[in-house]
């Protein structure tokens, strides 16, 4: 059980930002990653579709890779599917919304927090509810940014157009008075430098990867599931879309290719 992998799932490449942090904090753990790039983005999809797709990824990892923990490294999937999956599976399941909310509350000075995310994440008000459940009286400004996920998935964030897309998307958030901005989508940290430039140095930018990895570490330790092997872990990354594009983005984000990349088909893997 100890040497079984951690499963990380996302609608595409965004969850790589979380996987990278888990690999940094838990260097002995093996990661099996599934990015549903073929059906990305999840943000504008119907809730029942997001639930179905998230279950397909989870079921694939359980059946074929016998994971010991599932990390839903997608804010949209966390908002829609976390509670059901967590209540159903007998392994630890964590999402990215609560960790991000906790971090933002630690950082803010003026108690004004902004949240950017996909249409579904913002519509769910999952971040607002998480923030206010942890600390009453916060002022929470939310903004859907539907252009950012397709932009990251296309790989064109590697050129100068990133600043323009960020400006067009975040303009309404600029003058709200927030001092802390939650990147409520795991794709967004890939654009963090552009977002920081646009929002200014006086706004703290929060991504949930660090806190999510810390939560994974705490839970695995508490349950006695940390890998004690001295062998270097071998990570595997699966994409439902274009393998080469996934590899290019992964290589850019990590600075190297952190494991083998393969394609996988998830349709009809799981039927509710």
Swiss-Prot record:
Family (UniProt): Belongs to the aspartate/glutamate racemases family.
Listed NCBIfam families: glut_race (TIGR00067), PRK00865.1-3 (NF002035)
PROSITE patterns attached to this UniProt entry: ASP_GLU_RACEMASE_1, ASP_GLU_RACEMASE_2
Name of the protein in its database record: Glutamate racemase
Cross-referenced SUPFAM superfamilies: Aspartate/glutamate racemase (SSF53681)
Source organism of this protein record: Bacillus pumilus (strain SAFR-032)
EC number: 5.1.1.3
Catalytic activity as recorded in UniProt: L-glutamate = D-glutamate
Active-site residues per Swiss-Prot or TrEMBL entry: 74 (proton donor/acceptor), 185 (proton donor/acceptor)
